[in-house]
């Protein structure tokens, strides 16, 4: 049983580089030669180094949720209320001066009007998206500091006006009416008789909410039919229609003070405004003193988000009314048997909201999916190995439809059989790029020889600059956990855990057998030998040099866990970002065998935190010498003392090496990154000869071990990927709370009342006290008492928040003293009645806590966590670019306006064939 708060990260073989970086590339100049066929055809082509893998609901966005993914296509084949649109491509010169940024605006997409009801009862209607005001340059030389800036409007009825933005601060109800006479398109590009209507948003909400099996069964589905649908309609390894698939984002609406239960009640969700159907979002607490959250809701939930991508209610209703007209296809676009159609297809035989919304059949295949976006999806072309997305002639924006300078087709090509060697793939791609056979190429994958070729003729190759701004992606993807998952019963521990007993005892205070038996506690990891061990190891490394090896000097280390360009978010309500405090939040401290802060002295100056600036001054003649931090010599001695103490306290393990093997979490490990990891492993053995660390790349013969590392925590490391719910450190901390079991850690800190730890980590101690105070004011109904959350068995602790185990019954094991999840006779977890939604509880806590803290205290907390939560070198966000403006390659005929935090804006791309 797996329940995640949301799908945060999706890893493809390769995503369009300009889209990933989320900023407009800028053409320096243009030459004129024979137009490539793709340019003449207004086609954008991208190629993957992997075969196409069909899956169910591949082209249907109506049962999905969360932030847009670069590797997805839904954002340009489907539509929702609103979108962001770029008005122009930026202009950045060779000196990296931004002469003109991309200006962008909010755009009424399917919405005709936005109606706001304010706290004083006033109703305001905004019926256009004019954005005629473009902000002036903010630098003294007449240039801009950012390459993407929002345009505004003086039109008081525009959603881009200052009046609208200010009104959101006092809004208690937001409604959308829908544009008239927008028709859906099928996979052949044909106009259907089905219109986009307000009710479509009700259907898409139900389709998304009913992803969760218990919700589905309560609304007409059954476990038996779920199993049938999973086996007959879905690809073999699919989680769809199982209890491992769930919708985990509803808590977010509660964080934004919305009554999400109303979304499931058609009479409350689809109301009337001036006689028209209006989709209605109502505040839960309308008290005049309650801070409105509609700005956050507007920014997070209505843009770059899949939650409200429509499903055609008219089409679904028609098929339910006339099932004889319906042809039912599996994920392979193959028609299913009449028996399966009877059991899972449309009709009036079944009742419930799941059947009403076509839960088992709508969108399973491309052929049963309808599109209201600027492009529509054709079925996969197995002859040419590509997916094609064609311009939708039925799209509501007729001016865009009739224009001849935008994209008519987006084509994604796939490998015929299996991946080829990565270096060979990029070598081929560069040739294709030069010939115009693919539209973009990641500059970071160029060899030095290829870069030299590019720089000789920048205009020909479409050389331009992009700006990398990261406001929303937390810099943690895989992290070491304080409590380790248990293996399946009867497992040979030598073939499961990727570390030995000495390592386990040092870091976790338990042997592998004790971990497997569910006896591990938090003590050693939080404030014992585990804290000393990992902080010494982290602080001993010169992460500046590690980044130099990994990225050839293009990046600087980022060991802080928060998004570097995200707002701090404190009570000052200013625009300070985490990156404004770069040296502080990326400084590392360490603690000796007794838990005391380690101090250093250099040139008469005493210090206890090693900053990147200090490490930049480290010199050496070999890579291993350069890998030493500014405190290396002291830390080496302190580690020797720690190990000596360990040997005395653990005589059966005395003299043993501390071994661990970690796998690189992704299948493609480039040579530079591998060299950096190999150098780090050798470095650790020189820090102390008993440290035997190994970083292993993925290979097919090790796939089982790699999967167990990645998904089952065999190295004590688990997936923690997280995208912000809104622009504030509060959301980044929220992700850590579930991702690295920070809630359990805070309870442990509060309960232990350890004077040494509390002195070393005063902000963590303050935080622990605060969350208990908050819980007193907002009591939780939990299967484990709040004050005992640090006593959950390590078998279930990671899943308590991450997978929603708090919805099930726990029982205290009298032998171990740990709380364990209870199961019925069939092996199913037993539900816990009226459980508090901890996702909501934690998110609300962080929102309130951070908004009341000063930025200075938030930075102190961030810095403490940089040290406390160890550095994970296989995390590819361990570094950030030295310069925000970096080179990129996009075919010189293409102009791409893009927006920070957005995916590749195919609709907004234009082609200049001159």
Where in the sequence are the language-model features?
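Surface-exposed binding/hinge segments that line
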Residues: 171, 175-180, 194, 199-203, ...
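Aromatic- and charge-enriched surface segment that lines or borders ligand/interaction sites
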Residues: 110-224, 229, 524-529, 533-534
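N-terminal lobe/hinge region of extracytoplasmic solute-binding protein
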Residues: 47-166, 370
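Extracytoplasmic/periplasmic ligand-capture domains
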Residues: 181-190, 195-213, 374-550, 571-869, ...
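Membrane-penetrating hydrophobic segments
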Residues: 2-18
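Gly/Pro-rich hinge or "lid" segments in bacterial periplasmic/extracellular proteins
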Residues: 297-423, 427
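Sec-dependent signal peptide cleavage junction
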Residues: 23-41
């Amino acid at each position: 049983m797996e329940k995640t708060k949301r799908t945060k990260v999706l890893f493809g073989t390769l995503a369009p580089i300009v889209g990933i970086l989320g900023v407009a590339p800028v053409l320096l100049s243009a030459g004129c030669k024979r137009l490539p066929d793709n340019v003449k055809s207004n086609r954008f082509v991208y190629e993957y180094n992997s075969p196409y893998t069909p899956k169910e609901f591949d082209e249907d966005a109506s049962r999905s949720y969360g932030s847009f993914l670069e590797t997805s296509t839904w954002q340009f084949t489907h539509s929702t209320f609103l979108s962001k649109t770029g008005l122009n491509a930026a202009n950045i010169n060779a000196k990296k001066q931004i002469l003109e940024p991309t200006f962008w605006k909010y755009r009424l997409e399917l919405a005709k009007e936005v109606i706001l009801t304010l706290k004083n009862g006033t109703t305001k209607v905004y019926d256009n998206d004019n954005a005629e005001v473009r902000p002036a340059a903010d630098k003294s030389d007449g240039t801009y500091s950012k390459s993407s800036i929002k345009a505004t409007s003086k039109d008081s009825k525009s959603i881009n006006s200052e009046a609208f933005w200010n009104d959101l601060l006092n809004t208690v109800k937001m409604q959308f009416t829908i544009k008239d006479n927008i028709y859906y398109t099928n996979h052949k590009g044909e106009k259907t008789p089905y219109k986009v209507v307000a009710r479509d948003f009700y259907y898409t909400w139900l389709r998304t909410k009913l992803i969760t099996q218990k919700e589905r069964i309560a609304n007409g589905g059954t476990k038996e039919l779920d199993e049938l649908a999973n086996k007959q309609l879905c690809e073999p390894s699919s989680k769809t229609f199982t209890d491992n698939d769930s919708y985990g984002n509803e808590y977010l609406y509660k964080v934004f003070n919305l009554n999400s239960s109303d979304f499931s009640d058609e009479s409350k969700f689809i109301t009337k405004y001036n006689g028209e159907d209006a989709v209605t979002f109502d505040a839960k607490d309308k008290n005049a003193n309650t801070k409105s959250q509609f700005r956050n809701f507007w920014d997070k939930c209505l843009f770059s988000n899949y939650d409200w991508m429509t499903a055609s209610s008219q089409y679904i209703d028609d098929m339910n009314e006339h099932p004889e007209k319906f042809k039912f296809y599996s994920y392979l676009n193959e028609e299913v048997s009449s028996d399966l159609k009877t059991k899972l297809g449309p009709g009036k035989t079944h009742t419930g909201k799941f059947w009403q919304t076509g839960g088992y059949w709508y969108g399973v295949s491309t052929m049963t999916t309808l599109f209201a976006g600027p492009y529509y999806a054709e079925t996969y072309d197995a002859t040419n190995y590509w997916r094609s997305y064609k311009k939708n002639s039925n799209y509501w924006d007729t001016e865009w439809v009739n224009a001849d300078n935008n994209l008519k087709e987006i084509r994604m090509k796939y490998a015929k059989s299996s991946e080829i060697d990565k270096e060979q793939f990029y070598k081929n791609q560069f040739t294709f790029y030069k010939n115009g056979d693919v539209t973009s190429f990641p500059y970071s994958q160029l060899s030095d020889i290829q870069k030299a070729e590019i720089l000789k003729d920048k205009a020909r190759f479409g050389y331009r600059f992009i700006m990398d701004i990261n406001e929303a992606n937390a810099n943690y993807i895989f992290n070491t956990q304080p409590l380790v998952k248990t293996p399946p019963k009867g497992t040979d521990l030598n073939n499961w855990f990727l570390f030995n007993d000495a390592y386990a005892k040092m870091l976790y205070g338990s042997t592998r057998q004790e971990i497997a038996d569910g006896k591990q506690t938090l003590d050693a990891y939080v404030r014992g030998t585990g804290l000393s061990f990992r902080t010494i190891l982290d602080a001993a490394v010169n992460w500046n040099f590690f980044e130099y090896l990994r990225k050839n000097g293009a990046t600087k280390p980022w060991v802080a866990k928060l998004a570097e360009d995200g707002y701090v978010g404190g009570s000052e309500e200013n625009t300070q970002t985490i990156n404004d405090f770069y040296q502080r939040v990326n400084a590392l401290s360490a603690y000796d065998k007794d838990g005391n802060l380690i101090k250093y002295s250099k040139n008469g100056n005493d210090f206890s935190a090693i900053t990147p600036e200090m490490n930049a001054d480290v010199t050496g003649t070999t890579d291993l010498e350069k890998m030493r931090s500014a405190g290396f010599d002291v830390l080496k001695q302190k580690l020797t003392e720690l190990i000596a103490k360990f040997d005395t306290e653990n005589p059966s393990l005395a003299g043993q090496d501390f071994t661990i093997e970690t796998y690189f979490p992704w299948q493609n490990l480039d040579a530079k990154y591998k060299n950096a990891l190999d150098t780090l492993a050798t470095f650790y053995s020189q820090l102390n000869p008993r440290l035997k660390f190994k970083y292993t790349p993925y290979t097919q013969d090790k796939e089982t071990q790699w999967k167990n590392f990645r998904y089952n925590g065999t190295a004590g490391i688990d997936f923690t990927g997280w995208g912000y719910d809104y622009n504030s450190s509060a959301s980044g901390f929220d992700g850590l709370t579930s991702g690295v079991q920070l809630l359990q850690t805070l309870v442990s800190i509060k309960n232990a009342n350890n004077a040494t730890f509390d002195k070393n980590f005063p902000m963590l101690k303050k935080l622990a006290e605060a969350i208990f105070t908050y819980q007193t004011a907002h009591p939780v109904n939990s299967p484990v008492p709040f004050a005992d959350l640090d006593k959950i068995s390590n078998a279930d602790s990671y899943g308590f928040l991450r997978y929603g185990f708090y919805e099930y019954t726990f029982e205290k094991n009298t032998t171990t003293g740990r709380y364990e999840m209870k199961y019925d006779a069939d092996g199913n977890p037993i539900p816990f009645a009226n459980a508090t939604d901890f996702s909501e509880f934690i998110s609300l806590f962080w929102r309130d806590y951070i908004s009341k803290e000063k930025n200075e205290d938030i930075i102190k907390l961030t810095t403490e966590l940089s040290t406390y939560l160890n550095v994970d070198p296989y995390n590819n966000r361990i570094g950030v670019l030295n310069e925000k403006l970096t080179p990129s390659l996009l075919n010189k005929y293409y102009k791409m306006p893009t927006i920070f935090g957005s995916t590749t804006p195919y609709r907004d791309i234009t082609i200049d064939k001159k």
